[in-house]
Structure formats: structure tokens, C-alpha cells
């Protein structure tokens, strides 16, 4: 029985290994973590206080249906995957899809105030040196998400090509929030893709377009840099909302890393608006939860204040050159209310850092932390999938 209670930080990193069709993999996620998913649906304030009431209105239902229809046209396999999660967990599908719509519904209805008026987000550090290639990432979220996440290692083989990119096989590992599809946090796949996501709260959102969570889910199937850019561009539809993607491919002969800022098209083009930054060998990069290069209005002042504070914290350090440097920076608590590592050891804190992952691109491993990486050792260090 789900209690709807927020627990103190657990020293645990759940990992599920599963294989099958999209529906079967989703069902396994739902069945395995059903109690966690049900609990999260009880606790989620944005879902219960904003998304569900708006969904009950005629206009809200219209926006929900047109966006679901758009996703079904492009990525029917991922809708089946989410249906599997709902069936396995024995929860209602529309609640899970509303979580994936995030702020699209309230923004399309000009609902005020926007529910996500909290400094949620995450921080990513890329180190691309000859002798040290790392991608480190904090996953920060509303406190109800604490202890409501898991890693999924999935191998999906379809009997015929799936979706707009005709994908037949996927093999990946991804951190998932309870009830969410893989791909919108930190992930890697068997083609050597490694990536992390920074949420950006754009003022301009588009209903009937592709929610960022489904674009990054499709990113999990990509096999090279051009393929990744094609998925992010989402020609014919385009992104409904905004985020930043930090990524590289292990086999890239250039050893190039990238940060891509993705936003809805300001010109109503049927494709995403992208700004691509290369991070070549010998360089490093930081990204948090604001546009650094795209010139679009942003909706969440607290998220912007938090982003500015975290970037100032990173800027006070010498450029990172080692895994220890990255651990110290991602565990930094010097920024006051908007520090990098967020934990005040009480359940009344609005936002917490729920997990940290550090990808070692040279050793081809990921180190997973559920607590401050500057003070603790990783729970585990897992080999990256690679063909």
C-alpha cells in the first residue's frame, strides 16, 4: 500500500535489467517499481495541483489529446512503452503522460502561476582532456522525487522497424524518475552514446509538438553524431519545450563533446530550434538550467537565480582536470540557498539533489552516487554498454 510519505535519503540505487518489446520493457519497469510509482503519483504536487485539474477542462483535454496524437504519429513505440509502465504498475496512463507533458499544458492554457516555480534542475560538467575525459551530472528535483528513481538497463528488439526513424534494436542504461520513460536524465547506449539533460524552463511552449522527454527518449536509439542531431531537430514536428543536452560518442575519432540547447521554434517552424556548442579535446564545459546561447524568454526566475549561483560556484574553481575535481565541484555546498549539492537533511526542503553520475569516457564506466560525491564513495561503478 502506497503511503504518500516522503522518506529521508536512502542509501540505495535500484537497477533493473530487462529485455523484450517496448511494451514488455515498460511493463517490467512498472511491475518492478509499482509501489514507488504509485507513491510518487500521490506525492507529486504539480500533477495533483495543476496538471490533473487542467486535464479535466475541455481545453486541457484537447491539448492533451493533440499532443498525444502527435507523439503517437512519430513514436508509437514509446507510447506503448509508457502504456506498459502504466499497466505493470496498475496506474492510469493519463497521469503518466501528464508528467511527460510537464509544463506544456499549463503554459498552453496560460495558467498562472506556472506550477514549476521552484529552483529545480541539474548541473553538468564536461572534462575533455587527453588524459581525463569525464561527464559528471547531478540530478536535482522536487523533494518528492527523492528515493523515487531507478536505473533501467534495457535491451529492446522489435520484429519490424519502429517509429519515424525505423528503429529495430535499442540497448541502453538510463536513470528514470518513477513512472517516467528512460532518457530524460543521464543515460548511455550500446553505440557509445553518453548524455545528460538539463531542464530549461522556456516561456514559449508549443502544444501538439514533441515533448522534450520523447525527443530524448528517441536519442537513446541513436548511433552517431549526425543521427543525434537529426533526432534533436525532429524535422516535421519540433520540440514542444526546452532543455540542454550534453553528449558524446565514445568511438568519435575527433573525441568531440557537445552541448546542444534545444527550444521550440520561435518562428513556428516544424522543427526544433537548436544551438550547438562543440567542446573539443583540451576544453571543458559547464551547463545548468538556463539558456546560455539561445535568446528566448525563460519562465522560472528561481531556476535562473539557482543557475547563476551554480555557474558562479563553478567559475570560482580552476578548470577541472580529474575525477576528484569533478566530485568536489558537484558536491559543493558553498552557494547558500542555491548551492550545487542540495541537501539540508530535512524533508521540508523543496528541491534536493537526488543522485549523481560520473561517466569516465576513457575507462568506459559510470560511477553512481545517491549522496554527496565529495564526501562519499560511489555505490557502484558499472561498465558502459558497448557493441
From Swiss-Prot:
GO terms for molecular function: beta-alanyl-dopamine hydrolase activity; beta-alanyl-histamine hydrolase activity; hydrolase activity. GO terms for biological process: cuticle pigmentation; dopamine biosynthetic process; histamine biosynthetic process; histamine metabolic process; visual perception. It catalyses: carcinine + H2O = histamine + beta-alanine; beta-alanyl-dopamine + H2O = dopamine + beta-alanine. The protein is synthesized as a 43 kDa precursor which is then self-processed into a 15 kDa alpha subunit and a 30 kDa beta subunit. Processing appears to be necessary for beta-alanyl-dopamine/carcinine hydrolase activity. The beta subunit carries the beta-alanyl-dopamine/carcinine hydrolase activity. Changing residue 122 to A: Impairs self-processing. Does not affect homodimerization of the unprocessed form. Loss of carcinine hydrolysis. NCBIfam families: C45_proenzyme. Its EC number is 3.5.1.-. It is an enzyme of class 3 (hydrolase). Expressed in body, head, optic lobes and retina (at protein level). Expressed in photoreceptor cells R1-R6 in the lamina and in photoreceptor cells R7 and R8 in the medulla (at protein level). One of its GO terms (cellular component) is axon. The keyword Nuclease does not apply. This is Beta-alanyl-dopamine/carcinine hydrolase. The record marks 121-122 as: Cleavage.
Amino acid at each position: 500500500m502506497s503511503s504518500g510519505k516522503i522518506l529521508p535519503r536512502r542509501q540505495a540505487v535500484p537497477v533493473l535489467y530487462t529485455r523484450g518489446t517496448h511494451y514488455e520493457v515498460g511493463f517490467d519497469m512498472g511491475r518492478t517499481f509499482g509501489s514507488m510509482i504509485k507513491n510518487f503519483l500521490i506525492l507529486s504536487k504539480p500533477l495533483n495541483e495543476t496538471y490533473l485539474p487542467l486535464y479535466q477542462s475541455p481545453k486541457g483535454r484537447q491539448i492533451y489529446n493533440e499532443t498525444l496524437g502527435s507523439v503517437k504519429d512519430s513514436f508509437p513505440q514509446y507510447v506503448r512503452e509508457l502504456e506498459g509502465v502504466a499497466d505493470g504498475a496498475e496506474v492510469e496512463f493519463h497521469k503518466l503522460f501528464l508528467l511527460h507533458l510537464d509544463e506544456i499544458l499549463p503554459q498552453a492554457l496560460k495558467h498562472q502561476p506556472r506550477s514549476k516555480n521552484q529552483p529545480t534542475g541539474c548541473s553538468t560538467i564536461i572534462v575533455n582532456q587527453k588524459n581525463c575525459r569525464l561527464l559528471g551530472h547531478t540530478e536535482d528535483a522536487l523533494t518528492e522525487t527523492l528515493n523515487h528513481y531507478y536505473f533501467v538497463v534495457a535491451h529492446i528488439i522489435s520484429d519490424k522497424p519502429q517509429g519515424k526513424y525505423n528503429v529495430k534494436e535499442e540497448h541502453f542504461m538510463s536513470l528514470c524518475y518513477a513512472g517516467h520513460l528512460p532518457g530524460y536524465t543521464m543515460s548511455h547506449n550500446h553505440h557509445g552514446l553518453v548524455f545528460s539533460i538539463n531542464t530549461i524552463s522556456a516561456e514559449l511552449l508549443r502544444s501538439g509538438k514533441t515533448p522534450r522527454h520523447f525527443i530524448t527518449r528517441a536519442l537513446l536509439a541513436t548511433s552517431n553524431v549526425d543521427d543525434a542531431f537529426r533526432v534533436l531537430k525532429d524535422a516535421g514536428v519540433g520540440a514542444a519545450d526546452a532543455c540542454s543536452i550534453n553528449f558524446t560518442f565514445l568511438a568519435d575519432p575527433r573525441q568531440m563533446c557537445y552541448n546542444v540547447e534545444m527550444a521550440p521554434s520561435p518562428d513556428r517552424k516544424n522543427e526544433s530550434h537548436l544551438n550547438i556548442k562543440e567542446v573539443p579535446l583540451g576544453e571543458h564545459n559547464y551547463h545548468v538550467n538556463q539558456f546560455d546561447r539561445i535568446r528566448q524568454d525563460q519562465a522560472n526566475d528561481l531556476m535562473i537565480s539557482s543557475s547563476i549561483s551554480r555557474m558562479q560556484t563553478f567559475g570560482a574553481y580552476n578548470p577541472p582536470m580529474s575525477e576528484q575535481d569533478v566530485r568536489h565541484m558537484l558536491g559543493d555546498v558553498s552557494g547558500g540557498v542555491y548551492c550545487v549539492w542540495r541537501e539540508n537533511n530535512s524533508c521540508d526542503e523543496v528541491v534536493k539533489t537526488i543522485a549523481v553520475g560520473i561517466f569516465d569516457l576513457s575507462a568506459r564506466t559510470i560511477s553512481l552516487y545517491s549522496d554527496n560525491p565529495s564526501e562519499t564513495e560511489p555505490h557502484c561503478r558499472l561498465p558502459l554498454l558497448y557493441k
